[in-house]
Amino acid sequence: MRATPSSSPQPFKGLVVIELGHSVAAPFAGHILSELGAEVIKIEKSDGDDARRWGPPFWEGASAFFQALNRNKSSVVCNFRDPHESQALQRLILERADVVLQNLRPGHVEKLGLDGPTLLAQKPSLVYCNLGAFGRTGPLKDRPGYDPLMQAFGGVMSTTGEPGRPSVRVGASIVDMGTGLWSVVGILTALYERVQTGRGRVVDVSLFETATSWTSLLAAQYLCTGESPQKQGSGASGIAPYKAYITLDGEVVVAAGSDSLFRSLAQVVGHPEWIDDPRFVDNPSRVRNQVELYRMLDDLMAQRATRDWVNDLEAAGIPCSPVQSIAQMAEHPQTQALGLIQPVPDTGMRFVSLPLSLDGQRPVSQGRPPTLGEHTDSIDRKSTRLNSSHIPLSRMPS
């Protein structure tokens, strides 16, 4: 059954998250928590999160990037340079927050008195998550960073692309989004512990640490042999045949990663003699002779259409897939059957939902992305009711 905003699972309902976040990593973490029911209050500088301007394309007043990451959040504007407003923000955190997320530039929250140790000293139950660039310690801890820099520094780019050609960034922001995901893992760990102890924690994650985690299997090869893995194109180090091929009308990926699957592949491509060929008799042999094996498979695959290959390979039980565009993925019946792309209430927007379901229901957005400072006044008034010595946060110009 498809979930609607009223029936969508909201296991984090009642959890209040203050997001001092910009760009991708912290907003993606806030997005996950928001889609699962948390109230996420996004604190923005006076001209807003820079991601609002990351376009084109723009959709209903902000970039598609921003809208995808910030739906169902409140937006509050704060002039961090004004000490009165920083104090008001601190009070908002102490009064309402269960969780604080922050990925501001290194040292900024400490100057504002909004760092984890300062806030936990006043509110021990708070869970505070730092999303940094290089990590909480070490010679580079104070440097800023972004996804492509960390794909480069963390070794991801060095193993991505075709052999003999320049390194390539993975198209998706895997380091930014992975860091957001790891921050949620850390936050949930701390919240689970808080149920038992009543105390929060400071959680530290970073883009660099996330990048190293994505390369952990490749790093295992280096740690075992002392040799850095090389680029494999669409293939995988240590497994053959296991890559994409150009067909008559597109591309197809074939993953014949075991001896039995290779025997089946040899039959499908019309070369049963490969089964007993000493060069290809087992995976280590195929890896040693993969240049010749791939040359022959490349020639064969180019002779037929993608759909013909997929039909024959699937009939033989060989894992394979056409290389789909984003448009093909979005419109595929499997995507639609899973309800992976959902409309956003009160907008014409559609976005990819969280890749999980609870009791068969996928969490869906409860509200649209906020305009800049849209909720400053309403949250300001709520804080005023809580504290008679309230100093207001910024007002948006009319």
Where in the sequence are the language-model features?
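Conserved Rossmann-fold dehydrogenase catalytic segment
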Residues: 136, 164-172, 195-211, 230-237, ...
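Flexible, small-/acidic-enriched active-site or ligand-binding loops
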Residues: 2-3, 281, 345-385
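Single conserved hydrophobic/aromatic residue that forms the stacking wall/gate
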Residues: 382, 386-398
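A glycine-rich dinucleotide-binding beta-alpha-beta segment and adjacent secondary-structure elements
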Residues: 315-366
